């Protein structure tokens, strides 16, 4: 099956689908004042999600990542996962979560067809974690990760946003943590959004600083697979785990773009920091609109730019990452 390809030769096997803008954390870099609902939002329903995923699968997509906000706040998440996993052509169903509900809900997600797990974990130190996220929930997350291992989930990744002055001295602790754990930790460079300019100026840390420390500690960059995304992967012979660096301010970051995004309200976003969204929801109400939906997606892909405008301070439509799921 052919894959979606843009005018710059990039293929897109991967969709990030936001299920909600709501979040139960108050992360200092994203929603420091907590989630503020705009009226009564109506996020995509299961039948709309089914039509959406069938369309992207028909266009060659094989991986769906469910994001938020915090997707575990959806009470119908088990049904959503099962619906996505049942679509022919979808081989990988992943979720990105803050992990607080893993002990209670992960078994149900696993039974429904979840194949990969990403957990946001910005610090290994309990007090720091509380400072960054606004919640003292690190023990539940650690319990959930142990459960994920026990269930045999084949892909477990941890996401940590690099924050100068808050967690930038924890790399040695992370290395020790990965010595006996087969996780992949992703260090993500803080990105400027529409509402965090002052915070960005205080806490942005160049990913190069971490890469230099990794190389000095004997870690080696792994060859990039042909279908790899923008992360640079590092490994060490004495560690079971690996480290990925996601550096959106690096020169070649956008060359490795392999994903599209759909918001919780059904807008196609060609770039995390794009200037416009394409409404797909009107074509998600009837099965008979399947061909029109395919045409809208493929036509709009031709408008995808070569790269973002972060270096010029252009953050596009993204007020904060909870609005689109990163």
UniProtKB/Swiss-Prot annotation:
Cross-referenced Pfam families: Mob_synth_C, Radical_SAM
Residues reported to bind GTP: 16, 65, 96, 157, 259-261
Pathway annotation: Cofactor biosynthesis; molybdopterin biosynthesis
Amino-acid positions noted as binding [4Fe-4S] cluster 1 in the UniProt annotation, renumbered to this chain: 23, 27, 30
Cited PROSITE patterns: MOAA_NIFB_PQQE, RADICAL_SAM
Record note on cofactor: Binds 2 [4Fe-4S] clusters. Binds 1 [4Fe-4S] cluster coordinated with 3 cysteines and an exchangeable S-adenosyl-L-methionine and 1 [4Fe-4S] cluster coordinated with 3 cysteines and the GTP-derived substrate.
Keyword check for Oxidoreductase: no
Annotated binding of S-adenosyl-L-methionine, by residue: 29, 69, 120, 191
Cofactor requirement: [4Fe-4S] cluster
Enzyme Commission number: 4.1.99.22
Catalysed reactions, semicolon-separated: GTP + AH2 + S-adenosyl-L-methionine = (8S)-3',8-cyclo-7,8-dihydroguanosine 5'-triphosphate + 5'-deoxyadenosine + L-methionine + A + H(+)
Catalytic class of the enzyme: lyase
GO biological process, one term: Mo-molybdopterin cofactor biosynthetic process
GO MF terms, alphabetically ordered: 4 iron, 4 sulfur cluster binding; cyclic pyranopterin monophosphate synthase activity; GTP 3',8'-cyclase activity; GTP binding; metal ion binding; S-adenosyl-L-methionine binding
UniProt-listed PANTHER family: GTP 3',8-CYCLASE (PTHR22960:SF28), MOLYBDOPTERIN COFACTOR SYNTHESIS PROTEIN A (PTHR22960)
General function of this protein: Catalyzes the cyclization of GTP to (8S)-3',8-cyclo-7,8-dihydroguanosine 5'-triphosphate.
Assembly with partners or alone: Monomer and homodimer.
Protein name: GTP 3',8-cyclase
The species this protein was found in: Stenotrophomonas maltophilia (strain K279a)
């Amino acid at each position: 099956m052919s894959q979606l390809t843009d005018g710059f030769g990039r293929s897109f096997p991967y969709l990030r689908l936001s299920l909600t803008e709501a979040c139960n954390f108050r992360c200092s870099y994203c929603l420091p004042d907590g989630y503020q609902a705009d009226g009564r939002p109506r996020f995509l329903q299961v039948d709309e999600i089914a039509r959406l995923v069938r369309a992207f699968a028909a266009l060659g997509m094989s991986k769906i990542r469910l994001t938020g906000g915090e997707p575990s706040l959806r009470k119908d998440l088990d049904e959503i996962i099962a619906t996505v996993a049942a679509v022919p052509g979808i081989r990988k169903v992943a979720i990105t979560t803050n992990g607080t509900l893993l002990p209670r809900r992960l078994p149900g997600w696993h039974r429904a067809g979840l194949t990969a797990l990403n957990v946001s974990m910005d610090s290994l130190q309990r007090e720091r974690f509380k400072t960054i996220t606004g919640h003292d929930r690190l023990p539940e997350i650690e319990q959930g990760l142990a459960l994920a291992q026990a269930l045999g989930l084949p892909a477990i990744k941890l996401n940590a946003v690099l924050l100068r002055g808050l967690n930038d001295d924890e790399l040695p602790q992370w290395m020790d943590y990965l010595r006996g754990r087969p996780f992949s930790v992703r260090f993500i460079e803080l990105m400027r959004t529409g509402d965090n300019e002052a915070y960005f100026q205080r806490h942005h840390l160049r990913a190069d600083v971490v890469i230099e420390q990794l190389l000095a500690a004997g870690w080696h960059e792994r060859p990039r697979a042909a279908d790899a995304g923008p992360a640079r992967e590092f490994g060490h012979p004495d560690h079971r785990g690996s480290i990925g660096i996601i550096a959106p301010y690096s020169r070649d970051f956008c060359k490795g773009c392999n994903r599209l995004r759909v918001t919780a309200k059904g807008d196609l976003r060609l770039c995390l920091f794009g200037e416009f969204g394409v409404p797909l929801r009107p074509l998600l109400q009837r099965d008979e609109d399947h061909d029109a939906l395919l045409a809208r997606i493929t036509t709009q892909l031709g408008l995808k730019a070569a790269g973002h405008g972060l270096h010029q301070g252009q953050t596009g439509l993204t007020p904060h990452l909870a609005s689109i799921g990163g």
